[in-house]
């Protein structure tokens, strides 16, 4: 019998379980599959949630999180790794210590720190653990504008403020920074600080601040009128991880990830799953928007 599929690359997500299937591991694995990758997972937290609320949270011990990571990395390996909801300073430190053994693997860190209203969910110790332990290992970090403000202490309400926050975040050690979710009228704006260009220009000019601002790029799209955006941040960071694992340059990976998550939002814009904040559809390439499978 002829084989129909080539062997996929493996991508590991270190994230939470969402019983509603919209965010966390569910969003990541759907995104990985849609883009041709095989998803591995290390669960950090189990949540009882739906489209309206999070009812209960049970954290997995740092030791068990690391055991999951080691089990898959030592056997399957990974073309890329991403982190999502962690929520514990001790677990962040344990994850960072484990990941330091695989510095060659691209690492995307999505620092989940605020709820959908932009309010901080955790103690300052969690923020500091990201800054001190995970960010220095990261190829890319993907905070939204509220998380960027929390991490830097700076306002992030304009493009200029977004660029300033990204420059501050770069001092914590990540190679690249993508800040998401600035709304300008009917346009949604994400900002990417190209860390490679920052370092190259700083060496050439000796002016890191000027070099940083000239290394900032914008990813824009018209706002989609929908309440179904739950899991969009996870989908974006998961897509970026897949593309980086394929060896794409950062700018190309981010633009493709940006296009992918926009497609996932549009495909689920009219869904009525639950009565609150509904999911996006990372599998839009496989299913029609009316729910019928292609083919």
Specify the residue positions occupied by each region the protein language model found:
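Charged C-terminal helix
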Residues: 8, 59, 251-295
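Glycine- and other small-residue-rich loops at beta-strand/loop junctions that grip anionic moieties
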Residues: 17, 83-84, 119, 180, ...
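Conserved N-terminal subdomain of the carbohydrate kinase-like
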Residues: 2-13, 31-117, 283-289
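Short, well-structured alpha-helical segments that form the helix of a local strand-helix-strand
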Residues: 162-170, 217, 249-265
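Short pre-catalytic strand/loop immediately N-terminal to key active-site residues, enriched for Gly-Thr
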Residues: 14-20, 216-231
């Amino acid at each position: 019998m002829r084989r129909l599929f080539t062997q996929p690359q493996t991508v590991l997500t270190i994230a939470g379980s969402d019983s509603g299937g919209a965010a966390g591991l569910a969003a990541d694995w759907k995104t990985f599959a849609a883009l041709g990758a095989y998803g591995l997972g290390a669960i950090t937290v189990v949540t009882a949630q739906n489209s309206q609320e999070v009812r209960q949270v049970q954290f997995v011990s740092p030791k068990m999180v690391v055991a999951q990571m080691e089990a898959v990395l030592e056997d399957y390996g990974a073309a890329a790794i991403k982190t999502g909801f962690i929520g514990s300073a001790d677990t962040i430190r344990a994850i960072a210590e484990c990941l330091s053994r695989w510095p060659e693997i691209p690492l995307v860190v999505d620092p989940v720190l605020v709820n959908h209203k932009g309010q901080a969910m955790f103690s300052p110790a969690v923020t500091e653990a990201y800054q001190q332990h995970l960010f220095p290992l990261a190829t890319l970090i993907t905070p939204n504008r509220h998380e960027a403000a929390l991490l830097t202490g700076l306002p992030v309400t304009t493009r200029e403020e977004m660029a300033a926050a990204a420059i501050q975040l770069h001092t914590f050690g990540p190679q690249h920074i993508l800040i998401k979710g600035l709304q300008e009228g009917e346009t949604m704006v994400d900002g990417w600080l190209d860390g490679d260009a920052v370092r190259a220009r700083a060496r050439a000019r000796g002016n890191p601040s000027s070099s940083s601002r000239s290394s900032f790029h914008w990813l824009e799209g018209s706002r989609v009128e929908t309440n179904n955006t739950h899991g969009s941040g996870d989908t974006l960071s998961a897509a970026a991880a897949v593309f980086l694992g394929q060896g794409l340059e950062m700018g190309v990976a981010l633009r493709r990830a940006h296009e992918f998550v926009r497609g996932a939002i549009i495909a689920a814009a009219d869904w009525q799953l639950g009565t609150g904040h509904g999911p996006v559809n990372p599998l839009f390439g496989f299913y029609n928007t009316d729910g019928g499978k292609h083919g």
